Amino acid sequence: MKQIIYISIFTILFTFVSCNDLLNPTPVDRIIDDQVLTDANSARVVLTSAYRDLANLGAPKIIAGDLTADNLIHNGTFTLYREISSKDMSASNGSSSALWGVIYSMSYIASFLYEGLPEIDISQLEFNELTATASFLRAYAYFVGAYTFGGIPIVTSTIVEDNRKIPRATFEETLDFVETELLYALDKLPEESFNSGEVTNGAVKALLARFYLYKENWSDAEKYATDVIEGNGTKEYILEEDFENAVVDFSTESILEIVYSANDNPGTSTSFSINNLFVGRREIIPSSEMVLALQNDGGDRQVIIEFDGTNARGSDNGWTIVRYGPFDNIQLFRLAEMYIIRAEARTQQNKISGVNSAESDINVIRERAGVPLIQGSSQNQMLLVIENERRMELCFEGHRWYDLIRTGRAKTVMDEFTSNWTDKDELWPIPLREITNNPSLKDAQNPGY
């Protein structure tokens, strides 16, 4: 059965040529045309498009997680980043549109596979693996969408005209959808793959650990983090001895990463790689507060920033992020995060000290970084230690804003960082183009936009 889908989404195309292109995004028709599903191999070709969209989700997620918070500041000329950094984001912001667009592109591709796969002759094992991969990628996209925008429309069909009328789901409904997708994918994927650029059962369990941490389901967060740490139903991931080796491509602790090459434009639907934003143009730089935090408690993790006094002038503090090279992969999940997730889940269950405790988990990460170990903390003290440890260990990987929002610490922390922070900054705006083209979103914009 021939499956043809015309996917209409709104993404952002950026070029090096014109700043106007950055500030005036053009609607793009994403077409999966003449893809004839005849066997598992043809389905994998379609699935490649979803992986390509995952790549396009990389940098916008980092921008959302670190620039919206206090880890990064704007240092260049582009309005879309200035808006985010100054907490003056508009509904026409290009980063918001890019992130929203790629979520629905991934969703359409998953729907395409779900509609087409039952019509072809493949084994049950192949069907399970293909649909589980599609479900994981769609779940990850909606997970990011829910915590960036709040509840969003849940699209599971390829009928474009119907999809343009789908109303916004609630935040809880969106998360229920994510959980259903992940639990479907669980144990249907191989434990190992050629490299960490492919979704495995370890990636499913890692996202479940993060999902349940965000949901404050502490026992399940601990369970799935432990599964990944101990290799229960996953490959054996090994914590790198040195932090510097932990953040290189295909490290022994990498669970899932976005793979880039010289032929790609890493991170967004743009010609700007994340490295170009951080190093080439220095459009975005680490905040002075982030630099000081790394100097005080980062230990070996300071390796991800460098100082050049020739850049230090005006609001430019002279520091540059060197976490990513020109075509370096973006790590979505790595083993160190699982230790920190388990530490937080254990703290919330009052398993703070002793064997199999939050302290033992957090000290694994701190010992590698070469910073003093933690002992004798109260529950509240330990939660602040973990907040800081997530900031140090996962710096510039797109977590900080989401962490501050989910823990209710955003206002306290951000009021010390900027006088511009307001409650509206706890969510990004729904892109104006989406509201214009979907009548069901007309009165559904997030407060303050």
Which positions does each model-derived feature cover?
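Conserved, well-structured interaction surfaces
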Residues: 44, 79-149, 186-194, 324-333, ...
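Short, surface-exposed recognition loops and adjoining beta-strand edges that mediate ligand/DNA contacts
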Residues: 33-34, 60-80, 155, 190-270, ...
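TPR-repeat structural position
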Residues: 218, 352-355
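Hydrophobic-face positions in mid-chain alpha helices that act as interaction patches
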Residues: 68, 78-79, 222-331, 335, ...
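Membrane-proximal, proline-rich intrinsically disordered regions
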Residues: 19-65, 225, 415-449
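Inward-facing hydrophobic residues that define packing positions of alpha-helical scaffold repeats
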Residues: 47, 107-110, 114, 175, ...
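Long, intrinsically disordered, low-complexity segments
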Residues: 103, 177, 267-269, 282-284, ...
